[in-house]
Amino acid sequence: MKTINIVAGGPKNLIPDLTGYTDEHTLWIGVDKGTVTLLDAGIIPVEAFGDFDSITEQERRRIEKAAPALHVYQAEKDQTDLDLALDWALEKQPDIIQIFGITGGRADHFLGNIQLLYKGVKTNIKIRLIDKQNHIQMFPPGEYDIEKDENKRYISFIPFSEDIHELTLTGFKYPLNNCHITLGSTLCISNELIHSRGTFSFAKGILIMIRSTD
């Protein structure tokens, strides 16, 4: 499975051990200060993106020396650094894109990063946002299998569209059958699987799933 992992410049204390997310099929991309986070973890990114306005001159020289390819942008532009890096990753058509370093900083950036998940829905490429407490994904209509993860026991479903039609949860502590939920609903916050596996399905809308721990 081809994986592209992107590390943005969020607080390092919220980023999990990155060495647990790599294998011979994984490409790593650094975004702005996230490139320094990668180098500190002993991982050399294949590409680095950003205006690099949040790093020191010493860190910039370190990135220039280590990264095989550097994409430098003006601070004033029409896309965020992460958005530009994600577009590059999507063009490579991987099986999955995992993004780290996207929580714990500015709320406007975080909400913008949540919206970037929609690019995965449009291109049929799985995108997952990851920090130490949360895994966040976005889904189009369909039926999906889900495995229990004791490290991320809580599972929440949040509408990203005005309506979610015929939402069904099977194998959950709080099951649903063909339920209609609307934007702003908190009905599906903090559910749990009661078996090793479960399923969720819906007929119309766009749904965010968050798997989390305290």
UniProtKB/Swiss-Prot annotation:
The lineage of its organism: Bacteria, Bacillati, Bacillota, Bacilli, Bacillales. Belongs to the thiamine pyrophosphokinase family. Pathway: Cofactor biosynthesis; thiamine diphosphate biosynthesis; thiamine diphosphate from thiamine: step 1/1. It catalyses: thiamine + ATP = thiamine diphosphate + AMP + H(+). Catalyzes the ATP-dependent phosphorylation of thiamine to thiamine pyrophosphate. Is involved in thiamine salvage. Transmembrane segments: none annotated. Keywords: ATP-binding, Kinase, Nucleotide-binding, Transferase. It comes from Bacillus subtilis (strain 168). GO terms for biological process: thiamine diphosphate biosynthetic process; thiamine metabolic process. SUPFAM superfamilies: Thiamin pyrophosphokinase, catalytic domain, Thiamin pyrophosphokinase, substrate-binding domain. It is an enzyme of class 2 (transferase). It comes from the Bacteria. Its EC number is 2.7.6.2. This is Thiamine pyrophosphokinase. One of its GO terms (molecular function) is ATP binding. The gene is thiN. InterPro entries: Thi_PPkinase, Thiamin_PyroPKinase_B1-bd, TPK, TPK_B1-bd_sf, TPK_catalytic, TPK_catalytic_sf.
